[in-house]
Amino acid sequence: TTEIYTLSLHDALPICNTPHIKLIYAIPTFQNPTGKTWSLERRRKLAELSAKYGVAVIEDNPYGELRFEGESLPSIKSFDEAGNILCTGSFSKIFCPGFRIGWIAGDKEIIRKYVLVKQGTDLQCNTIAQMTIAEYLKRYDIDKHIAKIVEVYRKRRNVAIESIERYFPDTIKFTRPEGGLFTWIELPEGISARDVLVRSLEKKIAFVPGGSFYPNGNKENTLRINYSNMPEDKIEKGLKTLGEVVKEYISQSK
C-alpha cells in the first residue's frame, strides 16, 4: 500500500509560541527522504504560523523542478507577508551534482547578512562552477534540459514503484512520489532496516536506513530508496533482490 507521512502543523502551534524555537526548516516538495509533497493548505498555514509567531522558515527546494505528474504548487515563500521566509534552490539536481551551486530568495536585509556570513565562512562559491553554469544558461535552454531529465527520472520512478509492488511483501507501506529522487518504505513494526541492509549488502544492494534521518534513531523499520542513478533494468533487478531479502528476514523474524 502507499501512504504519505505528514507533519502536524496543529502540533506545531504550541511549539512555535515558545522562545526556544527560532527556525523551521522544510522541504515541502518531493522531500528527502520520503518523497512526500505538502499540500497548498499546509504551505499557506506554515507561512501564517511564521508571520504570527515571528519564526523564520528556510524552504529548501532542490527537487521542485523534477515533477513527473500532478499540479505544481506555489512555494511557501509566495505566501510570506512578514519577510520571515527564505527559499533556496540548487543546480546540483537539475544540472550537475558536483557543482554545489544554488540560490536563495528572501528579504533584502536578511540576504545582506547572509552574504557577510558567507564571506566569513569560505569567501565565495566555486568560481569555475559558477562561470560554467552561467555560460550554459547563455547558450542552451535549461528548461528543455530539465524536461529531458524529468522524463528519464519518471521512467525510473515508475519501474521502482512497480518493482516494489511486485516483489515486496504486502505488509509494507511506501510513498509514490510525484517527482524528485526518492521513495520511502516502511517495513512491519519490529523489523530492523539496518539488519536488512547487512543482508542486502551481501548481495551488493544498498539503501539508506530510515533511522539515519531521525536525530533519536526512531523509525528503525524504514528505509529510503534512491532511483535516480541506475538504468531501469538494474532498478528492477536490485529491488527484486531487496524484496527477496525483506521477505526472508520477515519470515525468519516471526
Predicted regions, residues:
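PLP-dependent class I/II
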Residues: 7-254
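Short, exposed "boundary/linker" segments that immediately precede the start
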Residues: 1-6
